[in-house]
């Protein structure tokens, strides 16, 4: 079963565009891809969600959203306030396993960070990853403050004995500041895992054709791309 869980060090760090890039590269390689969004928050029933955006950018992927809540809150809180049933880790794992039967790759995109609560039983994305025995790809921000949140996420993955695939910078600025440039070396050091890509800021605004053409150059070979961490860092020496 090939399942990759994608989490962030927080909200708005580029999880969806990173998920789309991984999906686009896999689709271009001829793999069948499914994208699972366990809980979509802050989106009305008539609006497009994160899984829809991944499909728009990446192309021919299967999408599945298990639950949707209108308020932009943690899933457990959003479900409770909406009077709707929450989604638990076992439901997430079961849905991912079913998708894996008919797809070469299943991408599970979380909400917020690794320990954001899905339900009132304190279930998290980490619990779902453990049930699936699936590695977790961590999407981090580029600038000041990212080292602490990335290291905390990495430590929690190791404490729970969950596979840690590596780190992707979800939005690399066009003109990176000193902290961002230094973090190219510091992020993999504090994470204890490789830097597996850097998505250009604004990549989600590209046309689908442009996004799919660019995606391989944003991701390392371990994610199916051609991006090289050393070559990238050499262009941004602090």
Swiss-Prot record:
Query: What keywords is this UniProt entry annotated with?
Result: ATP-binding, Biotin biosynthesis, Cytoplasm, Ligase, Magnesium, Metal-binding, Nucleotide-binding
- Whether Protein biosynthesis counts among this entry's keywords is no
Write out the catalysed reaction. (7R,8S)-7,8-diammoniononanoate + CO2 + ATP = (4R,5S)-dethiobiotin + ADP + phosphate + 3 H(+)
Q: Which GO terms describe its biological process?
A: biotin biosynthetic process
Gene3D superfamilies according to UniProt: P-loop containing nucleotide triphosphate hydrolases
- What pathway, per the record? Cofactor biosynthesis; biotin biosynthesis; biotin from 7,8-diaminononanoate: step 1/2
Localization, per the record, is: Cytoplasm
Q: Which SUPFAM superfamilies match?
A: P-loop containing nucleoside triphosphate hydrolases (SSF52540)
| Names of the cofactor(s) | Mg(2+)
Q: Which GO terms describe its cellular component?
A: cytosol
**Where along this sequence does the record place binding of substrate?**
41
**What Gene Ontology molecular function terms does this protein carry?**
ATP binding; dethiobiotin synthase activity; magnesium ion binding
Reply yes or no: does the keyword Ligase apply: yes
Which domain of life, per UniProt?
Bacteria
- According to its UniProt record, which residues of this chain constitute the active site? 37
The Enzyme Commission number assigned here is 6.3.3.3
Q: Where does Mg(2+) bind?
A: 16, 50, 109
Which InterPro entries does UniProt cross-reference here?
A: DTB_synth_BioD (IPR004472), P-loop_NTPase (IPR027417)
What residues bind ATP, as annotated? 12-17, 50, 109-112, 170-171, 200-202
The record's function comment reads: Catalyzes a mechanistically unusual reaction, the ATP-dependent insertion of CO2 between the N7 and N8 nitrogen atoms of 7,8-diaminopelargonic acid (DAPA, also called 7,8-diammoniononanoate) to form a ureido ring.
Sequence similarity: Belongs to the dethiobiotin synthetase family.
Summarize subunit and interaction data from the UniProt record for this chain: Homodimer.
Q: What is this protein called?
A: ATP-dependent dethiobiotin synthetase BioD
Source taxonomy: Bacteria, Bacillati, Actinomycetota, Actinomycetes, Kitasatosporales
Q: Which gene encodes it?
A: bioD
């Amino acid at each position: 079963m090939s399942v990759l869980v994608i989490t962030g060090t927080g909200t708005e760090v580029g999880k969806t565009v990173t998920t789309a890039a991984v999906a686009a590269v896999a689709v271009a390689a001829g793999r069948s891809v499914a994208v699972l969004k366990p809980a979509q928050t802050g989106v009305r029933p008539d609006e497009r969600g994160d899984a829809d955006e991944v499909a728009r950018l990446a192309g021919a992927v299967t999408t599945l959203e298990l639950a949707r809540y209108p308020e932009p809150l943690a899933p457990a809180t959003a479900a409770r306030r909406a009077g709707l049933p929450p989604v638990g880790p076992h439901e997430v794992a079961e849905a991912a396993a079913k998708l894996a039967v008919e797809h070469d790759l299943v991408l599970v995109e979380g909400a917020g960070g690794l320990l954001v609560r899905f339900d009132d039983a304190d279930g998290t994305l980490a619990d779902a990853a453990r049930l699936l025995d699936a590695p977790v790809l961590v999407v981090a921000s580029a600038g000041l403050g990212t080292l602490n949140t990335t290291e905390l996420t990495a430590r929690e993955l190791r404490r729970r004995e969950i596979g840690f695939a590596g780190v992707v910078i979800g939005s690399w600025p066009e003109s990176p500041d000193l902290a961002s440039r230094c973090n190219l070396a510091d992020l993999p050091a504090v994470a204890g895992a490789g830097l597996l890509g850097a998505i250009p800021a604004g990549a989600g605004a590209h046309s689908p054709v442009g996004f799919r053409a660019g995606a391989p150059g944003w991701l390392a070979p371990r994610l199916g791309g051609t991006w090289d961490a050393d070559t990238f860092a050499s262009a941004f020496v602090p």
